[in-house]
């Protein structure tokens, strides 16, 4: 029977207390690449969350039957299979977004968050807890992506979800978009500010020398 306290811990912990990006510094590369628009950030969040949750679930189901010498290969095969399914669904039902995400959906296979949860948690825990752990870490990853995507799209183009929020000078409005926010380095600074803000609110997360 699933432990409700453990489920609550693994589901809510990664949101702020043990965020994959802000605290563990995992999955940063894709966070730089897919956050120029809020829409792509949300789709990437959904994709990573589903892959992490179901890969952890399936790996946990067969964890006692996986030889230690090939466990990484088995994990990669399961993760890769799920990523292919997600990629094909995106191509079929959201082709434009799939084109914008480009190779980054495929690179979920090597995402440290997905591999890390499979190895560190799913190989040692029951299926339900592992599934919820995957959901929690996917959402923790997504919180940062959505915040970064929100700031970059709004300041970089004056839009959200492609809809004009701040009328630009070119269209007779007052706002002058800052194109620097559409470049990857801006995401570094925004993520850095998020990490600073989170650790200011939660001093216990600051590494001790």
UniProtKB/Swiss-Prot annotation:
It comes from the Bacteria. The keyword Cell inner membrane applies. The keyword Amino-acid biosynthesis does not apply. Its EC number is 7.2.1.1. The chain crosses the membrane at residues 42-62, 70-90, 103-123, 131-151, 178-198. One of its GO terms (biological process) is sodium ion transport. Belongs to the NqrDE/RnfAE family. NQR complex catalyzes the reduction of ubiquinone-1 to ubiquinol by two successive reactions, coupled with the transport of Na(+) ions from the cytoplasm to the periplasm. NqrA to NqrE are probably involved in the second step, the conversion of ubisemiquinone to ubiquinol. This is Na(+)-translocating NADH-quinone reductase subunit D. The gene is nqrD.
């Amino acid at each position: 029977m699933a432990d409700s306290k453990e489920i609550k811990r693994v589901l809510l912990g990664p949101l702020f207390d043990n965020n994959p990006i802000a605290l563990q510094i995992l999955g940063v590369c894709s966070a730089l690449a897919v956050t120029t628009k809020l829409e792509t950030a949300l789709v990437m969040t959904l994709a990573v969350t589903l892959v992490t949750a179901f890969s952890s679930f399936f790996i946990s189901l067969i964890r006692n039957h996986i030889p230690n010498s090939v466990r990484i290969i088995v994990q990669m095969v399961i993760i890769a299979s799920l990523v292919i399914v997600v990629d094909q669904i995106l191509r079929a039902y959201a082709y434009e977004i799939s084109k914008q995400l480009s190779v980054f959906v495929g690179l979920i296979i090597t995402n440290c968050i997905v591999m890390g949860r499979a190895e560190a948690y799913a190989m040692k825990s029951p299926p339900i807890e592992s599934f919820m752990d995957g959901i929690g870490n996917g959402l923790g990853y997504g919180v940062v992506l959505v915040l970064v995507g929100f700031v970059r799209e709004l300041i970089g183009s004056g839009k959200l979800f492609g809809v004009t929020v701040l009328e630009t000078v070119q269209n007779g409005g007052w706002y002058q978009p800052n194109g620097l926010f559409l470049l990857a380095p801006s995401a570094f600074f925004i993520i850095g500010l998020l990490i600073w803000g989170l650790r200011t609110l939660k001093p216990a997360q600051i590494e001790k020398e």
